[in-house]
Amino acid sequence: MAPKAKKEAPAPPKVEAKAKALKAKKAVLKGVHSHKKKKIRTSPTFRRPKTLRLRRQPKYPRKSAPRRNKLDHYAIIKFPLTTESAMKKIEDNNTLVFIVDVKANKHQIKQAVKKLYDIDVAKVNTLIRPDGEKKAYVRLAPDYDALDVANKIGII
């Protein structure tokens, strides 16, 4: 049985060769160049087509180390305010008053108070004083008492 299989194998390349030859003959007669229509341009300005722009793949990073975050939790909150009006806020409104970094925003102040004093913050109001410092009114969550927290951190 094996010799018959060997005899059948050479036949297909002959058929393929014949088909290839016919295809070549047809191409010679007809011509391989297709007749592409020329695009009619309606504008005098030529807009260059958008080409593929590959992303940069640098051989080495341009910065040796990432920049250190200078505005960490300890830098954001400078000190608590202990004025009479601040004490009134602690007693009446469940609010602590801090002097904070001018560049800090409300979210950063909230996170800093949460981390440093382990308390939940309801909301933060800020203002910039005439002397250029930023004051933050930190309203505590209802389940925390501002008077207890003030005692713990040493305001009172």
Swiss-Prot record:
Record has ATP-binding as a keyword:
no
Q: According to the UniProt record, list the residues that bear Phosphoserine.
A: S43
Its recorded name reads Large ribosomal subunit protein uL23
Q: Which residues carry this modification: Phosphothreonine?
A: T45
Q: For bias kind Basic residues, which ranges apply?
A: 20-67
What residue spans carry the region label Disordered?
1-67
Q: Which gene encodes it?
A: RPL23A
**Annotated domain remarks:** The N-terminal beta-like import receptor binding (BIB) domain mediates interaction with IPO5, IPO7, KPNB1 and TNPO1.
Location of region: Beta-like import receptor binding (BIB) domain:
32-74
- Tell me, what is one Gene Ontology molecular-function annotation carried by this entry? structural constituent of ribosome
Recite the UniProt keywords alphabetically.
Acetylation, Citrullination, Cytoplasm, Isopeptide bond, Methylation, Nucleus, Phosphoprotein, Ribonucleoprotein, Ribosomal protein, RNA-binding, rRNA-binding, Ubl conjugation
GO cellular component terms listed in the entry, alphabetical order? cytosolic ribosome; nucleus; ribosomal subunit
Q: Which residues carry this modification: Citrulline?
A: R41
Q: Main localisation, per the record?
A: cytoplasm
- Residues with the modification N,N,N-trimethylalanine, per the entry, are A2
Role, per record: Component of the large ribosomal subunit. The ribosome is a large ribonucleoprotein complex responsible for the synthesis of proteins in the cell. Binds a specific region on the 26S rRNA. May promote p53/TP53 degradation possibly through the stimulation of MDM2-mediated TP53 polyubiquitination.
